Amino acid sequence: KSRQKTTLGKIKQELTSSPEALNTMSDEVLDEFTYIISMLKDDQVLLKNEIDTSDSVYQKWKDQKISPKEYLNYCITQHWIDISQLNVDEKYADSTEVYDALCKYILKNIKTDTEFSKIIYQYMITRGEISPRQLCLILFDQGVLDYDDATVNKLKNGSLSPRDFLMKKIYNIEITPAQLALEPCTGSCVVTDEKTGEIRAMVSYPGYNSNKLANGVDSEYFASLQHDKSSPLLNYATQQKTAPGSTFKLVSATAGLAENVITTSDQIRCTGIYNDISNKPKCWIYPGSHGLDNVSEAIRDSCNVFFYTVGNRLAQKKTGSYNDANGIDLIQKYAHIYGLDQKTGLEISESKSSVATKYPVMAAIGQSDNNYTTVALSRYVTAVASGKKYNYQLMNKIVDADGKTVKKYKADYEDISDTLTSSQWDAIHSGMREVVSTMDRFQGFDIPVAGKTGTAQQTGHANHGLFVGYAPYDDPEITIAVRIANGYSSHNAATAARNVISYYYKETSMKDIKEMKAAGANGNIRNSVAD
């Protein structure tokens, strides 16, 4: 409280009596005012669409050469401030009165703003005003963790370090990924009945307590969800889109086989690098190589060079020479057959996935600008497994007050099985089976699973991990699509898929699942592109 009072006094001083240019401020004060301006824009008090970014005073602000007081006063004169949101008489107030009202608005709002308070706490920690040990004890005081006398005493007497304490709590999932809101902290999974297209499960993590938003909204709880850095209000199964990584190679295999640029027996040599285009892209195994692979083996090995070659051949098919647009047209054609350029038909909010629009060689391995939801990948792998492109539905039936069924719903579908011959489908399916049968995550697993992993890179962040598949391999009953955004490796998504399949077939109990520990909680994790 005293630190907050000091900070608010400092902000008030900057806004009124002793302004200084941004470039002379301490990092702490600069961060505070950066947040304040952002808050004003979010609240639509500072009208960002009205700001003339070519204005000389604005340029001085961007160059940190003027004070917040000078900038905000100038914003008022330029009508960049919506004074209707301030407690002033719009008709008669002069610029001084408007500025005073704006200052009061700022000071009132940051006093109760959680995100602004976090800036204060951050610098208190940096200065050593709050110790790591105190932070750990606060978790008990605030009810984040169940009180434990033994652990509290160990923290207090120094026999348990804050680092070891946190690592153990994370490992035991007493502190959850959602609470940390550090990558990775989100995930999604869709399980579908392969025979009917009925969605068996659709999971978005993190979630929230919907009971607090029904029959009267708990405003405090809703506000906490809105400010939660893990964005629990976003449905990660239907609304989040990322690159698909190598899960897209099943589309490329389909296109290559259907367009006869490869056969099921054709072999392509991987030397670790693809020399037929100017940027010479590498296989993930480089500086190693896969040698000769046919399409099934290329799916098993996730060989980039094989699928670069397929993309290049698709781009040359129409004219005999490379044409970017022609290659993309064919990739889009087969992505469309699998429904990847459409919404899936769900009755809830869903983002539309998007198929690559350029660079067919890179698009063929899931790069370029491919971007898909988890539910779209689910429909895609269901189509691969069944030869049917379903229009998904969440509604199962409607019943009246007496429990009598009024209406039943059933997913309709388009038969796409004639896209490939039975031997071509077999080649894709056997490749998917080999992916899983050679994967350490599935060793000793009694249920035969077929699947495809995908690792999608995102600049400046950990890789996304994806897995699509179906089980049992010989007579599929369910399909599954898993994405762990920024999950480092596709093998982490594959592990999650194995756990879901194991639970579905009652190989694992809920008790077993609840006793599972956090993978990688020892901090020894890194990006992997071996998918």
Model feature map: region roles:
Residues S2-S246, V251-A485, S528-D531:
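Beta-lactam-recognizing serine transpeptidase/beta-lactamase-like catalytic domain environment
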Residues T405-K407, A411, R498-D531:
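Short, gly/Ser/Thr-rich active-site loops of penicillin-recognizing serine hydrolases
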Residues A485-Y504:
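Amphipathic oligomerization regions
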